[in-house]
Design a protein with these regions (language model features):
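Transmembrane-helix motifs of polytopic, lipid-linked glycan transferases
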Residues: 105-125, 300-304
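Membrane-interface transmembrane helices that cradle and orient dolichyl/undecaprenyl
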Residues: 126, 130, 165-176, 206
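Transmembrane-helix signature of polytopic, membrane-embedded enzymes
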Residues: 97-101, 118-142, 311-315
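Membrane-lumen/periplasm interface segments of specific transmembrane helices
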Residues: 23-35, 39, 195-212, 216-316, ...
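Signature aromatic-anchored transmembrane alpha helix within multi-pass, membrane-resident enzymes
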Residues: 233-237, 352-382
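Loop-to-helix entry region of an early transmembrane alpha helix in multi-pass inner-membrane enzymes
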Residues: 73-76, 93-116, 285-292
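Multi-pass, polyprenyl lipid-linked donor-dependent membrane glycosyltransferases
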Residues: 110, 130, 134-169, 183-194, ...
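Short hydrophobic/aromatic helix or loop-helix immediately within or flanking a transmembrane segment
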Residues: 50-65, 71-95
Length: 384
């Protein structure tokens, strides 16, 4: 026992679990607060699992919708790995535990693992002096939009795989990193974009930060001389390709996950620029105006991260945000905080502030999260 107490990893895990417990206690306390204000008697499980959570619960219980089903919102848009893991635990518990409970346990375990390895990787992945590591779990558990990681949503698992990808990348364990990328692409399609982060980091590890045609040529030659690195690049999108193969046999359309999304929105705007212009100038709903400006702020943050030499992370963040912006700003707040790297950017900024400013900003972020949690309990459309 004394050896365990002296173990640095055990101490770190204990601190993370304390922060985690505080964040979940806030969620529990907000249930009677919400019920008291709104005059309802809803349970924690009911309030935490809105919209897509119900879709995932259906998949866990029944599998994917058959092509002959009349529901226009077929659940093929939801990638399978999270549901498969939940199915596994539901099966080994004999189906005795509520599906939402299983899903929330999986999500919460994933975000704890993510926070642990995020802190472990902080020293290698950032340029901040020691002493601020525990800011990361505070951000990951209590920053705005992090309540999704406690629900039956894929956010927590997706974040976990992204954290592990960058952790192994910093250790130069490229195959392990890309296995994590493959798992992330089986959780959400955006996981495929980690291949760009991999290529950026491989270039830096081989050629340094200098960019020239000679360096690029040397990088390409070096890559083709190293089958292990080529293999690592190729397996990044394996999860997504596996799901597309399944869809091809299941419903005859490998792109069904994309094509079915017209059931949620059929707006058509010019990709990225047109989407942001319409949103930021108030030509669509007010909530989308907010999301448009939110996206611009996040792009500035990623630019800051690139300036601070978080090259691989910032490239992943930028591309992962631009993809949804090809069609709409809907859900971009959730998507952004679900890619993890935004936490690193905020962490970097906070770590450079003096103590008072740092904790004031952190406190404001927690208050915003509590307000958003209330909106979530109220199924507010601003969170769609």
């Amino acid at each position: 026992m004394s050896r365990l107490k002296d173990n640095e990893n055990f101490k770190l895990l204990l601190k993370i679990l304390i922060i985690f417990a505080i964040s979940r206690l806030i969620m529990l306390v907000m249930v009677p607060v919400y019920n008291g204000i709104m005059g309802t008697h809803r349970s924690f499980l009911f309030l935490m699992n809105e919209w897509d959570a119900k879709k995932y619960a259906y998949i866990i219980n029944n599998g994917y919708t058959y092509p002959t089903d009349t529901d226009p919102q077929a659940n093929w848009a939801f990638f399978p790995l999270y549901a498969l893991v939940c199915m596994f635990f539901k099966a080994i518990t004999g189906g005795l535990i509520n599906t939402y409970v299983i899903g929330m346990i999986v999500s919460n375990v994933c975000i704890i693992i993510a926070a642990f390895f995020a802190v472990r990787g902080i020293k290698k992945q950032t340029h901040i002096k020691d002493g601020y590591e525990l800011l990361m779990p505070v951000l990951m558990f209590m920053a705005p939009y992090t309540f999704y990681s406690a629900s039956v949503y894929t956010e927590a698992m997706f974040i976990m795989f992204i954290v592990l990808f960058f952790y192994f990348l910093s250790e130069k364990k490229y195959i392990l990193a890309c296995v994590m990328a493959a798992c992330s692409s089986a959780t959400r399609i955006v996981g495929c974009i980690l291949v760009f982060a991999l290529v950026v980091q491989l270039y830096i590890d081989i050629e340094g930060e200098k960019i020239s045609w000679g360096c690029i040529k040397d990088f390409v030659v070096t890559m083709f001389k190293n089958p292990g690195k080529i293999f690592a690049v190729l397996i990044c999108p394996f999860g997504a390709f596996s799901y597309m193969t399944f869809l091809n046999f299941f419903c005859g359309d490998a792109w069904a996950y994309k094509n079915v999304q017209i059931a949620w929105r059929d707006d058509e705007y010019f990709p990225i620029v047109g989407v942001l212009w319409k949103a930021c100038t108030g030509q669509i709903e007010p909530r989308y105006t907010y999301m448009g400006w939110f996206c611009l702020a996040i792009l500035v943050l990623y630019g800051y991260m690139f300036f601070r030499k978080y090259y691989a992370m910032s490239v992943f963040g930028i591309i992962s945000l631009l993809i949804p912006l090809t069609s709409h700003v809907m859900s971009t707040c959730r998507f952004t905080f679900g890619t993890y790297v935004v936490f690193v950017g905020i962490y970097d900024i906070l770590s450079r502030c003096n103590k008072v400013v740092r904790w004031v900003i952190t406190g404001i972020l927690v208050i915003i999260e509590i307000y958003l949690l209330f909106l979530w309990y109220n199924s507010d459309s601003w969170l769609m």
